Amino acid sequence: MGALRVHEFTTVDGVVDAPMWTMDYGFPDDLAASIGALTAPAQGILLGRTTFEMFAPAWSTRTVEDDPGAPLFNDTTKYVVSSTLTDAGSVWRNSTAVGGYDAGRIRELKEQGDLYVSGSATLVRALVADGLVDELHLFVYPVAVGSGIRLFPEGGPRTPLSLLGAEGLSNGVAHLTYGPATA
């Protein structure tokens, strides 16, 4: 079975949405290398509808000259989890809608190979709750923004995890990798 790796840019206060705050920290080579290592094994990209609709116009016209990440996002099959979007392929090539969230369907996709998830906080919460995330990569930026969507919102269930790795990056970002809690 393939691995499911999640990538989130987050603030120290846990906010993961509208990450324009990342721009203040640049995109140094060590950050690019960390993300490259995370995405390299991906045979598919799993996205929630909202993230898909934000990524499609941003990535679909980019070339490798614009951004080294463009081939990953444009050439890799994208699976969109949505109960409302039915024709993802007409929005962004190599995209397919897989229907509303279904843990069994995600397991089937994992059987086909490694999956990469970026953003998609609602989807990620469900994946974590169902034990489908093998690696949760949090790129923690040294800023608190005070409000916004959190990956693990207040009032959510207790979610124990195990630290798999920690890396300090040159721009002050901490790359923390977590996996399912071990007994």
Show which residues each predicted segment covers:
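Portal/gating segments that form or line small-molecule/metal binding sites
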Residues: 1-132, 142-183
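Conserved catalytic/dimer-interface elements of ABC ATPase nucleotide-binding domains
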Residues: 137
